[in-house]
């Protein structure tokens, strides 16, 4: 459960990211593919090379979904219901992949904003990404 301090940390960090969210989403997705090659199996139709326009575009979708989640932190299940359905029923993404991407998102954000990435912010973002992952995998049960 996200505390009021966690919500404040997540919102303020996301505000600082601003217009870079899509860029960071693409970078995190590329980092996920490089670090965890099995995640590539869900994207056989993508050009997965460094700087791929398809990876960047999908990374922007991820970032947009997270921006929506940040805006609706008090109702993540409602905000992410359609995405949960898509990933569980149509795409059948292995739930572990959400944790892997979450880790890569944390690394990407820490690389770009080291001064702001305090232990408290790190913990809050980790809890937030975990909450998002839990919602996205809730339909698997």
Curated annotation (Swiss-Prot):
Modified residues (Phosphoserine): 3, 35, 49, 102, 124, 138
CDD domains in the record: Hb-alpha-like
UniProt keyword list: Acetylation, Heme, Iron, Metal-binding, Oxygen transport, Phosphoprotein, Transport
GO terms for cellular component: blood microparticle; haptoglobin-hemoglobin complex; hemoglobin complex
Record's keyword annotation contains Nucleotide-binding: no
Residues binding heme b, per UniProt: 87
SUPFAM superfamilies documented for this protein: Globin-like
Binding locations of O2: 58
Modified residues (Phosphotyrosine): 24
Cystine pairings recorded for this chain: none
InterPro entries assigned: Globin (IPR000971), Globin-like_sf (IPR009050), Globin/Proto (IPR012292), Hemoglobin_a-typ (IPR002338), Hemoglobin_oxygen_transport (IPR050056), Hemoglobin_pi (IPR002339)
GO biological process terms on file: hydrogen peroxide catabolic process
Phosphothreonine sites (modified residues): 8, 108, 134, 137
Tissue/organ expression: Red blood cells.
Keyword check for Phosphoprotein: yes
Modified residues (N6-succinyllysine): 7, 11, 16, 40
Stretches assigned to the Globin domain: 1-141
GO MF term list: haptoglobin binding; heme binding; iron ion binding; organic acid binding; oxygen binding; oxygen carrier activity; peroxidase activity
Modification sites for N6-acetyllysine: 16
Superkingdom of the organism of origin: Eukaryota
Family: Belongs to the globin family.
Cited PANTHER family: HEMOGLOBIN FAMILY MEMBER, HEMOGLOBIN SUBUNIT ALPHA
Assembly notes: Heterotetramer of two alpha chains and two beta chains.
Functional note: Involved in oxygen transport from the lung to the various peripheral tissues.
Official protein name in the record: Hemoglobin subunit alpha-1/2
Organism expressing this protein natively: Mustela putorius (European polecat)
């Amino acid at each position: 459960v996200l505390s009021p301090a966690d919500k404040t940390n997540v919102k303020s960090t996301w505000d600082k990211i601003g217009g870079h969210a899509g860029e960071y989403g693409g970078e995190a997705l590329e980092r996920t593919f490089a670090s965890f090659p099995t995640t590539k199996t869900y994207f056989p139709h993508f050009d997965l090379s460094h700087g791929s326009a398809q990876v960047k575009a999908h990374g922007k979708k991820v970032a947009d979904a997270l921006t929506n989640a940040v805006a609706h932190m008090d109702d993540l299940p409602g905000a992410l219901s359609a995405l949960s359905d898509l990933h569980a029923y149509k795409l059948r993404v292995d739930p572990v992949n959400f944790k892997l991407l979450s880790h890569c998102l944390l690394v990407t954000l820490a690389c770009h904003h080291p001064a702001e990435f305090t232990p408290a912010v790190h913990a809050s973002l980790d809890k937030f990404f975990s909450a998002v992952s839990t919602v996205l995998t809730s339909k698997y049960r």
